[in-house]
Design a protein with these regions (language model features):
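Phosphate-binding site recognition
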Residues: 1-176
Length: 176
């Protein structure tokens, strides 16, 4: 039987991402230790189960390679589904996204067993997808079974930057 293991599951929580110690060691090795605070702002924030302060390995390795801060991970795929869900979403989704972009948190139910058909105009399904994809992180959870109520925020500056660009793109494509 298949078992659903999500970002909120403790199983395998030590198997994903780089820890803060690993990142600090890598920064020192590359002579970039003075950038630790900026690296944390840009690429830290992932949570797997009860493990927090997990760094995105793709973004860290790209940063170590280039020495430049950029949106590496979020640009590895098309975010068109996310774009469509937020742009075409309810006013509640847009207001919550505005709060997230301002650094606030949102509280919502999460369904870790969502299916694609549930995404249309269902804010809890949208937040569930964003959490599962790594765009949101859990700040606090009260979990019961497959779901629960969660307090969520954007994962890090890289994600925040991606959403800002996405929303700015909506207005850049408007002809008056």
């Amino acid at each position: 039987n298949l078992e659903i293991v999500t970002t909120t599951s403790n199983k395998y929580s030590t198997s994903f991402g780089f820890t803060e110690e690993e990142v600090r060691n890598a920064l020192q090795l590359f002579g970039l230790q003075d950038q630790a605070d900026n690296v944390k702002k840009w690429y830290d924030g992932f949570c797997f189960g009860n493990k927090s302060d997990i760094y995105n390995p793709w973004s860290i390795t790209k940063y170590l390679d280039t020495g430049k801060f950029d949106s590496y991970w979020v640009n590895t795929s098309s975010n068109s589904l996310i774009d469509k869900l937020i742009q075409g979403g309810t006013s509640d989704i847009k207001i919550a996204m505005e709060d997230l972009l301002e650094g606030k948190t949102i509280e919502t139910a999460i369904d870790e067993e969502i299916i694609f058909e549930q995404l249309e105009n269902n804010s809890a399904a949208v937040w569930s997808l964003l959490l599962a994809c790594g765009y949101l992180k859990v700040n606090k959870a009260s979990k019961d079974g497959a779901g629960g109520n969660y307090i969520l925020s954007l994962t890090n500056f890289e994600v925040q930057n991606m959403f800002r660009r996405m929303i700015q793109g909506w207005f850049g494509n408007v002809s008056v």
